[in-house]
Amino acid sequence: LKVGTSLTPTFRIRERLWEDSQWKVLNFIFCQRCGHPVPGKHSTCHVDLMSRHDGRSISYSGGWHDAGDLSQQTLQTGDVTFALLEAYNKQRNINPALAARLREEAEWGVEFILKNRYGDGYRASSMGLLIWQDGVFNTLDDISSVRVQNMAFDNFLYAGYEAYASMTLDNDPMLQEYLLRVAEEDFAF
């Protein structure tokens, strides 16, 4: 490539050009996992971070931390999960090892999306966070102020993510059926 007077060294454009980048991004995403031990990075975290709605509580650990801090957004988890599922579908017949890791990470995201549904249109949606917690309930660092919202457009997006996951994660008929059911419910909200 030549830009002005600058010239890059010669490089080859090859088949499967993006696989190295996909592995690196996938490993970074794994390191951002919340509620899961990441060897050499952190132990299980934020189990005692909770949302509350209608007399019920849900632990908000799961999904992935934001890259800049420890915050969480369920809708962003949906966006990342959808991208991982799309990449999985493209790689499943080309690079089975990469596809398996993409699928595993997408399943982690699906679990977080599903566990934060209250089933009445409301969902734990987000929390800005800058601290590590001890993971023990009823101690000084417990946080129960995770935002809970019922947003029609967000529910529409979740329905799409859940439906796509239902079509993609085809090795677990019970999960497929559940994803399809909640997609229909979320679409109606």
Which residues does each PLM region occupy?
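Acidic/aromatic-lined carbohydrate-recognition and catalytic surfaces
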Residues: 14-19, 95-99, 103, 158
